[in-house]
Amino acid sequence: MRAWYFDELPGHQKLPHMGEPVPNQKVYDLGVKHWKIPLDGHEETINQIAKERDYPNRDIINISKEGLGELYDEKMVYFFQEHMHEDEEIRYILDGTGYYDIRETPTDKWIRFQIEAEDLVIIPVGIYHRFTLDEGDYIKSIRLFRADPKWVYMYRSKEMDVNPYRLEYLKQTKEKLGLPVAPAAVGWGAWLWSWITWSKL
């Protein structure tokens, strides 16, 4: 896996936008997990990881013009909007290539890393991220999930910034990085999130 800071220069999202290199350890410190699993016999390893993390269901997705058909352009915009999930995002790449962008704590800079065949990637709960194909315009992957796939995208907003899953992610990440954590941040955020949710009823 290769990682670098997204250069923020004009240009299509599928271009590398390659800025300063980022050590893989920095990506791991932000909660991303990565394994290289050979395609030959990958089923056994995937089954073991799915069992350990309690993800009993899976499907295969082909992200390409051919695979998505008329939904292709819409999905490219959809995947690239900054968002988080309340479940891990687990992908095992069977073929093709693409990019994940994740927000660095505490700078909020984008870090981009490329994924390719034989990569198993877990994007943690609560991290802001986005995905795009690269210029190859194709990726095929296995998706693991706990229940019927809903693929709920929780787009970044002031409301989402106080989501309990988001606050817990920040707390754990800052502790891992040795950064100060406000003692009451998670509790206050959970209360505010409850109030926001209640006010919408």
UniProtKB/Swiss-Prot annotation:
Record GO biological process: L-methionine salvage from methylthioadenosine
Record's keyword annotation contains Transit peptide: no
Pfam families membership: ARD (PF03079)
Pathway(s) of this molecule: Amino-acid biosynthesis; L-methionine biosynthesis via salvage pathway; L-methionine from S-methyl-5-thio-alpha-D-ribose 1-phosphate: step 5/6
Parts forming coiled coils: none
Record note on cofactor: Binds either 1 Fe or Ni cation per monomer. Iron-binding promotes an acireductone dioxygenase reaction producing 2-keto-4-methylthiobutyrate, while nickel-binding promotes an acireductone dioxygenase reaction producing 3-(methylsulfanyl)propanoate.
Compartment list: Cytoplasm; Nucleus
Gene Ontology cellular-component terms listed: cytoplasm; nucleus
Cofactor(s) required for function per UniProt: Fe(2+); Ni(2+)
Gene3D superfamilies named in the record: Jelly Rolls
Reactions catalysed: 1,2-dihydroxy-5-(methylsulfanyl)pent-1-en-3-one + O2 = 4-methylsulfanyl-2-oxobutanoate + formate + 2 H(+); 1,2-dihydroxy-5-(methylsulfanyl)pent-1-en-3-one + O2 = 3-(methylsulfanyl)propanoate + CO + formate + 2 H(+)
Protein residues bound to Fe(2+): 83, 85, 89, 129
Enzyme Commission number(s) from the entry: 1.13.11.54, 1.13.11.53
Molecular-function GO terms, alphabetical: acireductone dioxygenase (Ni2+-requiring) activity; acireductone dioxygenase [iron(II)-requiring] activity; iron ion binding; nickel cation binding
Keywords: Amino-acid biosynthesis, Cytoplasm, Dioxygenase, Iron, Metal-binding, Methionine biosynthesis, Nickel, Nucleus, Oxidoreductase
Residues that hold Ni(2+) according to the record: 83, 85, 89, 129
Family listed: Belongs to the acireductone dioxygenase (ARD) family.
HAMAP family: Salvage_MtnD_euk (MF_03154)
Protein's recorded name: Acireductone dioxygenase 2
Gene it is expressed from: ADI1-2
